């Protein structure tokens, strides 16, 4: 096992910044030592959004964005090192997810595209970098997502208690950790993504703090029913999705043809959509005793309250209560996946992704011991 100190870097679909964590990893033991949040420049965020939503682009624009994100991720790692005083030579490796700009897990040429040049990260930090985690799973017929359930299984499973772990980022994904059963996991649908886009459009706020705006509105049942009729929600697992599907254009199509709905009621209804689509999947799997929630959505008080109401037999709690920061869960997972790759251990779960077999994940971008610069 390649035990040591690892750095995980995550920039998710919410585009609310770059999360960086430092952790000591030794087998099943993952001890978080520090975290750092690096801002996402507004222009870069807008460029990513444009690409994610299928706007016309060029190879030059894709290449530039790949380079810019690689530099941003490298600078984020340097920010963590500066904050902690840890030297680069004390880090075994960086695990970097990259920035997803397109995820197309079905069809003859299934693929997932994460930008953020790992060569630049390695060069800027002088630390071996592991990245491009999703495409190996897809090469074996998998969805390439979600990958975090393997980490959830390693750290949060229980021998007798029925647990599920829910990450609410831009997209919500669920890991089912049920005793005696293979781990299952999939994207339930929108997490914060539509809520964030809507409040930005109408309130110029990046997110609905504590769910406060949504609390002032009412659920519009015709809109909720229209959205719930989307075929994605009835697809069987394995399944995964992203901003290329659930985006502002999708929401506009749902609103078209309905009587006018006030902006605040749309926000309330989007919150209810996230809660209902999550809880329906929990119930379809036979329920659980604890639903452990992480990600930015865990801070949305209305969303948490609605899930508790929809799951009366389940304790809805935070992963923080079990020793894992909900804000840092995904970055920690990719530090752990880098550890798995360098240790020669598989990182995917075929029962989750639908791949034909377990496999090593990612590419390794090594550096010379003394820097080579």
From Swiss-Prot:
The keyword Kinase applies. One of its GO terms (molecular function) is kinase activity. It catalyses: 1,6-anhydro-N-acetyl-beta-muramate + ATP + H2O = N-acetyl-D-muramate 6-phosphate + ADP + H(+). The lineage of its organism: Bacteria, Pseudomonadati, Pseudomonadota, Gammaproteobacteria, Enterobacterales. It comes from Serratia proteamaculans (strain 568). The gene is anmK. Its EC number is 2.7.1.170. This is Anhydro-N-acetylmuramic acid kinase. GO terms for biological process: 1,6-anhydro-N-acetyl-beta-muramic acid catabolic process; amino sugar metabolic process; peptidoglycan turnover. Pfam families: AnmK. The keyword Transferase applies.
